[in-house]
Design a protein with these regions (language model features):
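Surface-exposed patches in mature extracellular/periplasmic domains of secreted proteins
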Residues: 48-62, 75-85, 119-134
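Bacterial N-terminal signal peptides
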Residues: 5-15
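A short alpha-helix/helix-coil micro-patch that ends at or immediately precedes a cysteine
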Residues: 23-72
Length: 145
């Protein structure tokens, strides 16, 4: 199996802005809206830096979803299994950002933007596809070539 360039960050950025209070979660009905908004915000941010937009890929969304479900079940923000997720795509480059407890897509993106490693992942020029998922308060962004 082709080895992926592992650019997934191992640093975890928690709250740059005030997170929602414990117990408050992204409502299930709002999850699709949150994902659409976050996707648009990521692509707008990339465009401001002269980068191409990322297309939404169902297979990457499924990997992001599995990871967000796992983090929620374990109540632990992590990059556990990143190497396996990346290798399963057979892509040359994959990046991953995770987040927890951001009340809106805008505050989630802002948290990532203010973390150098997460920001680098958002602005990785080699990736072209992305998947996003939200399970309770756990967000996963997964992008590959």
């Amino acid at each position: 199996m082709q080895m992926c360039s592992l650019l997934g960050t191992l640093s975890l950025a928690f709250a740059v802005h005030s997170p929602v209070a414990a117990g408050n979660e992204v409502p299930a009905a709002a999850t699709d809206t949150y994902i659409r908004e976050l996707s648009q915000l990521i692509n707008d941010y990339r465009a401001r830096h002269g980068l191409q937009p990322l297309t939404f890929a169902e297979n990457l969304a499924a990997l992001a979803n599995d990871h967000s479900v796992d983090m929620a079940a374990r109540r632990k923000l992590s990059h556990d299994g990143f190497r396996n997720r990346a290798q399963s795509t057979r892509s040359k480059v994959c990046v991953e950002n995770v987040g927890w407890n951001y009340p809106t897509a805008a505050t989630q993106l802002d948290g990532w933007r203010h973390s150098p490693t997460h920001d680098r992942n958002l602005l990785e020029p080699k990736v072209s596809r992305m998947g996003l998922a939200v399970t309770t308060r756990y967000v996963a962004f997964f992008a590959c070539t």
